[in-house]
């Protein structure tokens, strides 16, 4: 698209924004508030305000966040593409350069770029990098393709990459010395390049989130403090790769996976908070397989202070042919510092022969202070479990029950009374029950939708 068309497009947007905004009524507003208004406008409309007056041009130059998406050039209100592909992409690149030139880039904290034209990115990012990375304090790059030059920045603190993109080779000169937060949304790395090259080039990285359709072979980092791993590949594969978590300093772990017959290798010495969201695999006929092995993972979870097992994790532990339902007592035995226990789906949890109720084995030496029950339905089985837990937890101070579905106040009050009437080993819980009674919304036993 030539410059005349580009200028015409900008003018049209400026007129449109002027029509939509009552400028006279906004003149009395302070600059800080107007900058916030610009922040919530789509980038194309926000930058068009710079054509309205010198004040608006100055105001837009104060915006700290920049979101660029070529969708606004491909799709128009009339429902069809106005220009040919090359013209559209060229127009988008020119728009990017003009926007960054207007902003100056020195004060930008968050930059977001979305585009399908992967092969053009190196040229574009190279042309804007003097602005983009100068005095940049915080950055979030989200796009369907990304230039390799994004891997070299001395200012980048937060980076988000996605989605469904293959990354065959990470540049050997990759260097992100101050990167602290990294999100990888369906990024495929070959071999162990994720850990050997990418993570190795991020010495300050503390928070890593990975969403993946296949298992990465290795996640290794000595400086990570928080790790979230979600594996969405659910089909049964005996020869599946063995996941290795070599993250000895992680204190907060979220792990969602379809465990295989071969257990993952883990090095997790510092865990304090763990949430396990485990699911059963399916074979080629979509039949559930229940021979998952999570012993290595469980054996590495020691001395945690907060343990959360989701409903699906509870179900997997129940159904496993390897009798993995015993891992919960094992976890509790290995966690003398456990203070918070979160359980879901108690209505399906641990039965003995002929459906005889079997309570969860709780070590007598436990120091659990808070118990959270999620997806509570008010069944007799759940009440038995809660009663069993209350009798086994002498240090308990707080019980939270999260309802599976919304309920009216009358039903909620009935469920509250059912729990309040249960005996408890903790003197603090008993004292609170006596003081408040069953009809109160108890401070120590609370029901939440």
Curated annotation (Swiss-Prot):
Keywords: Leucine-rich repeat, Repeat
CDD domains in the cross-refs: F-box_AtFBL13-like (cd22160)
One Pfam short name: LRR_At5g56370
Keyword Repeat among UniProt keywords: yes
Keyword match Electron transport: no
LRR repeats mapped onto the chain: 133-163, 186-212, 214-231, 247-278, 286-311, 320-345
Disulfide bonds: none
Residue ranges constituting the F-box domain according to the UniProt record: 23-77
Protein name according to UniProt: Putative F-box/LRR-repeat protein At3g44090
Organism: Arabidopsis thaliana
